[in-house]
Every structure is written in C-alpha cells, then in structure tokens.
C-alpha cells in the first residue's frame, strides 16, 4: 500500500510539473510563431521539425539520448565537461525528457488558437495606450486560458500514461505505470497490478472527459471564426530578440538530442 501511495503521489507530481512546463514553453513557441516576424526562414523550419519529431519517433528516444549525452559516460558530460559523476536519473530527468517530448504538442494546439484571436481587439487596446505586456496579460492571455488548460490536461494525461521514459530514466522514482509493470514481472502479483491499472485508467479517463467535454467547449466558445484582419507582427527588438533566441536554442537542443543518437553507438 505504501508503494502504491508513493507511486500515485509521484505520478501526480510528475504530471503537474510536466504539464505546467510543457504548456508554458509551448505557449512561448506559439506566440513567437504567430506574433513575431521571424527574420530567418530556417528558424521557422526548425520549429516545424521540432513539432513533427515527437510524432514520428518512439517516446523513449529522448531518454536514451539524455543518458548518452549527459549520463556518467555521456558524450557531453564526460568528454566535453569531464564530469564523471553526472546523475540524470530521477524526477528531474523524467521532467526534462517529458517536457522536451510533449511541449511540441502544446505548441501545435496553442498556435492554432492564437491565430484565431482577432488582432483588432489587441490593436484597439494598443491605440488607447496599453503596453504590449498589458495587452498580453489583459486580452491575449484571458482569451487563451481555456486553450492553455486544454493543452495542460493533454500533456498531464500523456505524462501520467508514459511508461518508457520513467522506466529508462526514472531511477528510484516510481510512477504508477512502472509500478504496475514491476508488480507483474517482479512480484508476480497480477491482482495488485490490475487494481493499480484501474486507478491509473480512472485518473486518465477523468482528465480526458474534463478536457473533451468541458475545456474543449470553452475553447471553441472563446475563439470562433476567423480573424477580421491581418495581424501586424511585433517588431520591437526588446520583445522579439529574447523570445526568438530562447525558442531557437530550445528547438536546436531538441533536434541535437535526436541527431546525436546514432553517434552514441561510437562511444562507450
């Protein structure tokens, strides 16, 4: 019972952290894509690649890449920074891997919603003297809240149901998915595993119905139809440069982790 309770708390904690981080990073990517005029076309192509990678690759790829790059015998940790006691296992490792895996889903969901916000509403606020930050906090963000909640729940469900990443990089951090597996293969307790599976299934189904029949309707009611005019992109460098640099670095890092996997076979 104690093991189940620990696994349940760990699973909820992991889902909450991953959901918040994935939604936040996905929102930043969507905002840059929709509101900022990207100076270089390759940045836009990089964003498109990042959005497709989680769809076409196995879910455990980033865990494997993280171990190869930053583990105790990692290419970067050992051969570049000469760190021989690097520990990527546990909650922090799973959070990083799941966030990098799932935030593109939030990015794609929120990108479509941002495009449907009528720019005339935001421009009217700007015309009466509201700052760019105030427009975002008082107009854009409130309109996006149902969509952000939707993206958060989808990511939460993905995180809770994920088995491969916690199994590879979780270490002694048990989740419901890994505990159920070990209950069957290690303890040969199929009855206990079935009971835990019912709890996990119930949790994901409850979240799914909230996302499907409550938040999805709110999102549709908030953002309907098409924008009445073309959105003028943000040109203020104090806004565009930090956001673009952050998103480009994150996207390049994700692509690097996928690209480096074949090279991992060359190192012991």
What does each model-identified segment do?
Residues 178-203:
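Helix-loop-helix hairpin linking two adjacent transmembrane segments in secondary transporters
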